[in-house]
A protein has these predicted regions:
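Proline-aspartate-enriched helix->loop->beta-strand connector
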Residues: 116-128
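Structural recognition of the conserved hydrophobic beta-strand(s) that form the central parallel beta-sheet
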Residues: 79-81, 104-106, 125-128, 165-172
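The Walker A/P-loop phosphate-binding site
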Residues: 5-96, 115, 119
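Long, basic/Gly/Ser/Thr-rich N-terminal segments
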Residues: 1-3
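Substrate-engagement module of ASCE P-loop NTPases
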Residues: 147-168, 172
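Conserved nucleotide-binding/hydrolysis micro-motifs of P-loop NTPases
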Residues: 55-57, 83-87, 95-98, 109-113, ...
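Flexible beta-alpha connector loops of hexameric P-loop NTPases
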Residues: 24-26, 52, 78, 100-108, ...
Length: 177
């Protein structure tokens, strides 16, 4: 005999797909043609995109180029770095011609602090580099653990929807997957 638990009332109701109102104004072009092509037109407000790959392959450089290009169109963004100092990222941004007043930068790994920064800056795009460095102290496990990565990523999905912001998570491919 299998027991099930009820957890409150459903938060939504089924609807015919044609009756669903598109709250997102569609994708927002990044300014990088090839990235926009791969993403089907650009980043979608309220969504999360994962940029993954092996360490050293250029993920951080790519997302910084993306922010520089978006800033050229007046798009406010927030780059959250859990790996490099703000000075290191500024140096790379300078090299990539991505220095712009529309790009905000913070070195942070604590999930609640990142939420606060997103609310303060009110960006259209948030980059989190990398998801493996994030930490929610309430979970009690180490940063980079499967539990931390899963729960922090899920929390950022909720933040993306709540603030209607496009979130890009940078993730390293590891031997563990």
């Amino acid at each position: 005999v299998r027991e099930t638990a009820t957890v409150g009332t459903p938060t939504s109701r089924p609807a015919r797909i044609g009756d669903v109102v598109d709250d997102n104004a569609g994708s927002r072009a990044t300014g990088l043609a090839e990235v926009d092509r791969v993403l089907g037109g650009g980043l979608v407000p309220g969504s999360v995109t994962l940029v993954g790959g092996e360490p050293g392959i250029g993920k951080s450089t790519l997302v910084l180029q993306l922010l520089g290009a978006a800033a050229g169109s007046g798009v406010r963004s927030l780059y959250v770095s859990g790996e490099e100092s703000a000075a290191q990222i500024r140096t790379r941004a300078e090299r990539l011609a991505a220095l712009d007043d529309h790009v905000w930068l913070v070195s942070e790994t604590v999930l609640d602090h990142i939420r606060t920064h997103i609310a303060e800056v009110d960006p259209a795009v948030v980059i989190v580099d990398s998801v493996q460095t994030l930490h929610d102290p309430a979970l009690g496990s180490a940063p980079g653990s499967v539990t931390q990565v899963r729960e922090c990523a899920n929390a950022l999905v909720a933040v993306a929807k709540e603030h209607n912001v496009a979130v890009v998570l940078v993730g390293h491919v590891t031997k563990e997957g």
